[in-house]
Amino acid sequence: MQESNFIHITAGIAQVIEAEEKLLSRLPVEVITQRRNRQNRTIKQILGHLIDSASNNHQRMVRLQYSKDLLFFPDYTQDNDLWIALQDYQNADWSNLIQLWKCYNLHIIQVINSVDKNRLDSYWCDFTGAKVTLREMIEGLSLIHI
């Protein structure tokens, strides 16, 4: 097994958090609640979706380090809009959302820094049946999707 150092990934996440937290906190209410992307999501809903992504990644990273069984996780990608609606991100407190997003991603850094290197080849199967290793998950974290 090759040795892995994920410092470039964790440093990148930290840089995104530092830059984006400042930007997000300065956005006016009308921008975060009315401006929509091509999926018809507001900025509040997009940030909520990023929190959901972090929570799903967190669950996978931790479970892959101890599970002895093959793991199958639900297909979160098909349920994004449902997750956003059920959690009512549109009406959530903006400052709380920013802090939750920040803290969850800081915790992801902690999880990555503490990962059991002997478990990097542990894998789960996505909804298509494709195998995804812990190493691939970490290396595949997109800084534009933090």
Regions found by a protein language model. Give the residues of each.
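Conserved small/polar residues in nucleotide/adenosyl-binding loops
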Residues: I144-I146
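Acidic interhelical loop/turn segments
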Residues: L24-Q39, P74-D88, I109-E139
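Amphipathic alpha-helix face/heptad-repeat signature
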Residues: I9-V16, L50, L97-Y104, M137, ...
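Structural signal for well-ordered, non-membrane alpha-helices
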Residues: A14-S25, S55-V62, K102-D116
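Short, helix-capping/interhelical loops that line the mouth of catalytic, cofactor-
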Residues: M1-I9, T33, N56-W101
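Generic serine detector
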Residues: S4, S25, S53-S55, S67, ...
